[in-house]
């Protein structure tokens, strides 16, 4: 297969009618320079289609696919519903004797079916994909209904068959009620992990059925899977990729997704970049085509501007994708014609040379920098409801840290330093925790308390003392990390924004970096953030006062940047020296780190000083226009070299390359 960067996903109203399809093809032919692939949706509503309806759709799609291929596109089908999403137009939807997706209370979703129901797999899924193959697609995408969170029941599947299988495989005798009680008990982390593995295996079994079915028809058809952050599903992407690729024998596609349907505010796109980065990091290396989902649901023209739609593609390639899948087209009946989308596709064309540069350079290389603390078993570690809380909250807790410009890493084994919050440590194995505690870790009081309760107090250096509800000032101590602002203070107004605030109790050898006082100077806590080096050589920093919030003042920003240089043993690939709001991603290419910058401000960033890893005389700066500038060093700082960046316009991106890559 020639390298595919971008695809367009096409809804049924835009292909089922001859005139609508002709308009679609005319539009996309004009943008073949930036879109190489077309994926036709199998359905325009979210429960599974009856097989008779699917047969009609696929017979029409055979003609559409043939014509699109003749026009030079790679072309295939996006099966919207394999097990189903949620109730919609149920009079047209599939019905049958199979097990429905069911929550822990026994409530069923009539529009979705249990992925572990073998009768459903053989009597519906296999025939559906055989019909799909008859349309002669280059590829078949399996949509993101392959999950366990379905409207209106929430997380599944706890049907009688699933509980019986879990009991049999794990030598248990749970009733539904007893299983609910056991899973909701936060101390039952191992049971939760066992359930998550059970969840992942059911999905893998379904994917194997699809693989076998397609192979029996035409093993030249490439299969792809769309995902989101799949915490309640067990997040076992290596297992799913193995099932879909038949043990790595076949090339497969992947499409990480997750919300961000509007650009107001654009923060949701930045958060989605993190979600996508975590999904990419969980994929095996043999998955080489990874297209981000870019979705403007419900596909209103004003849902997202052309610029923000195109910018998403750049962000997600920076985080780990190799291209993008644009699901942005309004449906034919609701607009005069598709020409209204030319502005969006022109914006995609404008950034495509830079997108291609990033994709070709970074590919599937890992991210370098500060690890955000995500774990595939994060759902097992939630402190509240296992059935209703979301394991992704641990990673998204740290957005304020990354706004300082620290490069965000999603790869546990290649990170330079680590973040931990709350009960997240429960997700990790002992081996993983010892790796963390032997490296450099920044954590909050919740993570400290969790680690101490798990038996790691000897390695953390602190314990949690009195907790505070009233406002305090955090005063910086006379420590090298506070050079230039010792004695100054940070005020986090707890009366407005309730946050974590507590006293830290240091052990021998721990160094306070700040302490808390009232507004009259009386000390309330002798340590609020502290540093400790344990017997494994690990550098442990604990913050008990707004550890992941209110970092926008120059003193806290400077302290945090110096701190992570220390925690990482000066292995960070990049760091802004100026006090600016900036997002960065660093990709570990075979020839060195490539650093990708994003300006999330409404203002141009001017005269920004940055530190780049290594002692070097120059680096290359490449803007979105792909013009290359050679930057000369403006000094050194330890193991890093200082450079002054050219102006970086609002909501734009740039690439920094050392000369060994350039």
Tell me what each language-model feature is.
Residues 31, 36, 41-42, 88, ...:
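Hydrophobic targeting/anchoring helices
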Residues 393, 408, 412-413, 419-661:
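A conserved amphipathic helix/loop scaffold
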Residues 2-16, 74-84, 141-145, 192-237, ...:
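Aromatic-lined carbohydrate-recognition surfaces of secreted/lumenal glycan-active proteins
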Residues 6-18, 43-58, 106-125, 187-205, ...:
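The substrate-binding groove and active-site-proximal loops of carbohydrate-active enzymes
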Residues 74-135, 152, 170-198, 208:
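Active-site-adjacent "subsite" loops/lids of carbohydrate-active enzymes
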Residues 1-40, 73:
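N-terminal structural segment of carbohydrate-active enzymes
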Residues 14-31, 119-131, 237-244, 305-316:
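Short, acidic/polar
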Residues 36-39, 60-107, 139-147, 220-224:
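Glycine-rich, aromatic-flanked loop segments that form ligand/cofactor-binding clefts
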């Amino acid at each position: 297969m020639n390298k595919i960067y971008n695809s367009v996903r096409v809804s049924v109203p835009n292909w089922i009618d001859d005139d609508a399809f002709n308009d679609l093809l005319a539009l996309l032919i004009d943008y073949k320079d930036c879109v190489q692939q077309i994926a036709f949706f199998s359905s325009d509503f979210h429960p599974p289609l009856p097989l008779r309806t699917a047969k009609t759709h696929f017979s029409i799609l055979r003609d559409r696919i043939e014509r699109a291929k003749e026009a030079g596109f790679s072309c295939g089908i996006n099966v919207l519903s394999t097990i189903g999403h949620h109730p919609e137009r149920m009079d047209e939807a599939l019905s049958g004797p199979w097990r429905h997706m069911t929550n822990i209370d026994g409530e069923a979703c009539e529009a979705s079916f249990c992925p572990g129901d073998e009768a459903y797999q053989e009597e519906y899924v296999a025939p559906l994909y055989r019909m799909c193959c008859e349309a002669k697609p280059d590829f078949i995408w399996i949509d993101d209904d392959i999950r366990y969170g379905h409207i209106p029941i929430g997380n599944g599947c706890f049907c009688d068959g699933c509980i019986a299988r879990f009991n049999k495989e794990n030598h248990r005798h749970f009733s539904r009620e007893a299983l609910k009680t056991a899973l909701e008990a936060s101390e039952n982390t191992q049971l939760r992990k066992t359930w998550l593995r059970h969840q992942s295996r059911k999905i893998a079994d379904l994917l194997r059925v699809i693989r076998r079915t397609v192979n029996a028809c035409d093993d030249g058809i490439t299969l792809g899977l769309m995902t989101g952050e799949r915490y309640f599903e067990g997040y076992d992407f290596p297992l799913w990729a193995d099932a879909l690729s038949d043990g790595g024998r076949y090339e497969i596609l992947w499409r990480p997704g997750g919300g961000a349907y509007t650009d107001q505010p654009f923060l949701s796109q930045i958060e989605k970049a993190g979600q996508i980065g975590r999904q990419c990091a969980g994929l095996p290396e043999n998955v080489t085509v990874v297209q981000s989902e870019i979705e403007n649901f419900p596909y209103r023209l004003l849902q997202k501007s052309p610029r923000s739609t195109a910018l998403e593609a750049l962000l997600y390639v920076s985080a780990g994708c190799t291209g993008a899948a644009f699901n942005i087209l309004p449906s034919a009946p609701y607009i005069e014609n598709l020409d209204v989308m030319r502005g969006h596709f022109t914006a995609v064309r404008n950034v495509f040379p830079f997108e291609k540069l990033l994709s070709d350079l970074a590919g599937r290389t890992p991210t370098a920098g500060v690890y955000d603390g995500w774990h595939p078993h994060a759902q097992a570690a939630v402190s509240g409801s296992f059935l209703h809380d979301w394991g992704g909250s641990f990673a998204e807790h740290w957005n304020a840290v990354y706004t300082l410009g620290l490069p965000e890493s999603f790869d546990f084994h290649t990170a330079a330093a680590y973040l931990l919050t709350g009960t997240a440590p429960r997700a990790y194995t002992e081996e993983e925790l010892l790796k963390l505690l032997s490296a450099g870790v920044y954590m909050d009081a919740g993570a400290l308390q969790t680690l101490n309760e798990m038996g790691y107090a000897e390695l953390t250096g602190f314990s949690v003392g009195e907790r505070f509800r009233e406002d305090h000032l955090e005063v910086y101590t006379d420590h090298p990390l506070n050079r230039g602002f010792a004695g100054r203070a940070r005020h986090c107004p707890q009366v407005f924004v309730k946050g974590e605030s507590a006293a830290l109790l240091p052990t021998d050898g721990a160094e306070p970096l700040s302490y808390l006082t009232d507004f009259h100077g009386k000390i309330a806590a002798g340590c609020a953030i502290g540093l400790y080096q344990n017997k494994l050589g690990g550098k442990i920093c604990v913050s008990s006062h707004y550890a992941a919030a209110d970092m926008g003042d120059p003193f806290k920003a400077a302290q945090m940047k110096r701190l992570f240089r220390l925690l990482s043993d000066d292995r960070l690939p990049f760091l802004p020296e100026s006090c600016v709001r900036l997002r960065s991603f660093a990709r570990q290419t075979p020839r060195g780190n490539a650093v990708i910058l994003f300006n999330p401000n409404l203002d141009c960033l001017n005269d920004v000083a940055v530190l780049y890893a290594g002692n070097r005389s120059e680096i290359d700066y490449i803007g979105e226009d792909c013009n290359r500038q050679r930057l000369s060093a403006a000094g050194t700082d330890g193991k890093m070299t200082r450079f002054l960046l050219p102006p970086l316009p609002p909501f734009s991106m740039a690439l920094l390359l050392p000369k060994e890559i350039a």
